[in-house]
Amino acid sequence: MKRHTRKIAIIGTGLVGSSCAYSIVNQGICEELLLIDINHERAVGEAMDLSHCINFTNTRTKVYAGSYEDCKDMDIVIITAGPAPKPGQSRLDTLGASAKIMESVVGGVMASGFDGIFLLASNPVDIITYQVWKLSGLPRNRVIGTGTSLDSSRLRTILSEMLHVDPRSIHGYSLGEHGDSQMVAWSHVTVGGKPILQILEEQKERFGEIDLDEIVEKTAKAGWEIYKRKGTTYYGIGNSLAYIASSIFNDDHRVIAVSAILDGEYGEYDICTGVPAIITRDGIREVVELNLTEDEESRFAKSNDILRDYMKTIGY
């Protein structure tokens, strides 16, 4: 992968793709931003609109619409294309339709000669990331999904409201499926460096009503609470994509909970799931293996088993 340029393509200029593009432009994350959509005129319109906001930023990003052929020189291709779940559906229910879209998208991108990093947000993101890895033939470190990055952010926000602490002082991760079966590694959640389990034990009078299982469920259902009120979510996931892309270009070595293809980590093989990973200019440098408790291991394995069952429906 080239190291001297900062070029991004976004495939899918719906609400998630356009929100991601807006974050990327405002933060000056890349030099060039290519927008691709099945509705080319929509991509053209988004590119025009974003170009017109450049003068109000401290950046100078070239934004334009194009096609898969233009992906050849891109460093990162972000895929947000895919159907939104309907009321009553889970993210997993969109798998069949999303998988068909990926076959066309990945084929077109790879035919251009693309040799960079795929960054996925299309749901169900863990399975779609695995599919894109298989279809592309790229090394597993260069196919990354947003995974539980947004869930981990939601977790920290929920805890911050309960504990009255800045969420940036809370560290911890949701693991497993970006969906209903995700779990939280509570044994590794800290507040100001202090284990949350210790805090809850020592301060029962203040925090005795906090129910950890309820927080896990609230975290997993947060997207649906937004969905019920405004129809879909896009700001959080758009910023998550921009954050990961920035970490790649800046070679930050930042630890982010992403969809990563596992090959022995956590005792799991041939599956893509949400885990903390070190993100660098080459993609995933290393999966961070947390020392989980027996109960956490069981919950994590159960989440992965659910993903495997759905993977079989598209031939994996």
UniProtKB/Swiss-Prot annotation:
InterPro entries: L-lactate/malate_DH (IPR001557), L-lactate_DH (IPR011304), L-lactate_DH_AS (IPR018177), Lactate/malate_DH_C (IPR022383), Lactate/malate_DH_N (IPR001236), Lactate_DH/Glyco_Ohase_4_C (IPR015955), NAD(P)-bd_dom_sf (IPR036291)
Pfam families linked to this entry: Ldh_1_C, Ldh_1_N
E.C. numbers: 1.1.1.27
Any single biological process term in GO: glycolytic process
Free-text activity regulation comment from the record: Allosterically activated by fructose 1,6-bisphosphate (FBP).
Positions with a binding annotation for NAD(+): 16, 37, 42, 68, 104, 121-123, 146
Protein name: L-lactate dehydrogenase 3
Organism whose genome encodes this protein: Bacillus cereus (strain ATCC 14579 / DSM 31 / CCUG 7414 / JCM 2152 / NBRC 15305 / NCIMB 9373 / NCTC 2599 / NRRL B-3711)
